[in-house]
Amino acid sequence: MITHTLRPEPKAHYWHITLGFTQTDNAPAVLKLANWVPGSYTIRDFARHIVEIHAECNGQPAALVQTAKNTWHTAAQAGEWRVRYTVYAYDLSVRAAYLTAERGFFDGACLLFAIEGRLNETQTLVLEHLPEGWQTATTLPAIGANVFQTASYGELIDHPVELGRIETLAFEAHGIPHCIALSGHYPDFDRDRLRRDVQRICETQLAMFPDPAPFAEYLFLLHLGDNIYGGLEHRSSTALHADRRSLPPHGMGEANEACTELLGLFSHEYFHAWNVKSVKPAAFAPYDLDRENHTEQLWAFEGITAYYDDLLLARSRVISPENYLALLAKNITRVQRNKGRLKQTLAQSSYTAWHKYYKADENAPNALVSYYQQGSLAALYLDLAIREQSAGAHSLDTVMQQLYRDWLHTRRGIAEGQWQTRCQEITGLDLADFFQTALHTTAPLPLAESLRTAGIRLQYAALPRSHGGGLGTDTLPSEPAPDFGARFSQKADHALLTHILNGGSAEAAALCPGDKIIAVNNYACTDLAGILAAARTGDTLEIHYFRHGLLHRTALTLREAEADTALLYIEDADKLGRWLAGTL
């Protein structure tokens, strides 16, 4: 048995960890710490947070040699080994370790050593000397008070742990125990509403997939803070971060925008229990946590999940059809406004996620396409195409259900290209042209044609960038809006340019990311958005800005905005209702 004992030192943000194991022969043990965490596809080099490390065997100091950035070899000596190390933990995220006097959290991958060749041995986790009053929330199987045990290392690191003062909201979905564990500081909110809405989302997803569910219990670890957002999936739980203002207030009718975003996060990470934690690329079966695990299939595992996360909010009726279409229009608009969609394919976006998407820079809108956003639109088109071509006999639901049955039977990952093959086998349709176009070219998807089959009309309009897309209205501006051609962050006394968009007004004026605009037409730039809202296409703005501490001046002529704002109109409410219900 391998034992991991953790002791917190909250004020220093240190986890003091002891790895204990028996070495039965005179051979070195090889210890490895993960370089990345499943579900977050970039190298994070967790070993850099190790502050000190030493070893002893049979109670005596023993040699421990580092042989790579995340690898250590013990001396070739049989006996009872203890490797003691300290890890700095101050990463406020869902994928690492965090420790203060108020709260602790960790994803086991970033703290716990694996012993090479012994991944399938029983692992015990012990939490010692926790601060008084701290509670523990995790789906790790408990064998005692703050003592947990798993059958393998892979299972050990797939149950994040939340520590501190925790509020719990429990419910059942399809007879399975579920719990929302809330941490952080947050205002009073409608607890019954949150519990009820999340329960409906879970029940809708459980009803979509065949039994048995991939978990016997499920835990949402929800940490609330200020302007934070994110989620990471695990086999029977998920770690979530959300803004404290996103909790449903008392008396709320239709879910507001912030609450809808929170419910979408719950939905997205829960869906991953089937799509990526169960059904997964062969490249992830098993995960190699030493190096990048490249696959062209992230569009199917993240993009399809991103399609269903909001769709299932509508299907479970926690948001209205109109609010769902507003979310869909915003997603279409985000994709349309990124010129990267014309340069990078979905397959390339998936494969290069490790060093491009997760390391996006100021040129990202011009060079990259998101396998989340574009992938969700490919899933939308695929779903509606299957429904139409099969006369309603099949849908993307059918494909996802059968892929899960496949996994229940084989427990194997999906090889490159196999997802597309199985989709066609399951539906009996020839979808080869769609997959070739959608995955391996930058040709636009014919979404307008596709959405008509669901009773929706898609129209693009040249609206200001402040309009992110939504439900259409009867009247549109008579002339296209002007477009500044840059993204910016407004500060108290200047606007900081963050992205310059190819072919736009700002690029033509030779502005650069990082420029600080201090004046427009000789007036202080305290509200650039307001200045642009009052301008018209063809207006020339005199811009004064700082670049690397040097004052510059340029003239910027506002070009016409592209028709890239998506507006959706309901033309057949019956068709729309049947699609959202999954019965079209």
Indicate where each model-derived feature is located.
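Non-catalytic architectural context of zinc metalloproteases
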Residues: D45-E52, E56, Q60-R200, T204-F215, ...
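Post-HExxH zinc-binding segment in Zn-dependent metallohydrolases
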Residues: T238-R245, S278-V279, D290-R341, L550
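C-terminal recognition in membrane/secretory proteostasis and scaffolding
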Residues: D309, I319-L584
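Juxtacatalytic substrate-recognition/specificity segment
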Residues: L169-L298
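Early extracytoplasmic/domain-onset interaction patches
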Residues: M1-N35
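A generic structural motif
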Residues: T22, E56, E128, H544-F546
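Short aromatic-acidic-glycine turn motif
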Residues: P38-D45, W134-Q135, A519
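Intrinsic-disorder/low-complexity, polar/charged segments enriched in Ser/Thr/Lys/Arg/Asp/Glu/Gln
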Residues: M1, Y14-T18, P28, E80-R82, ...
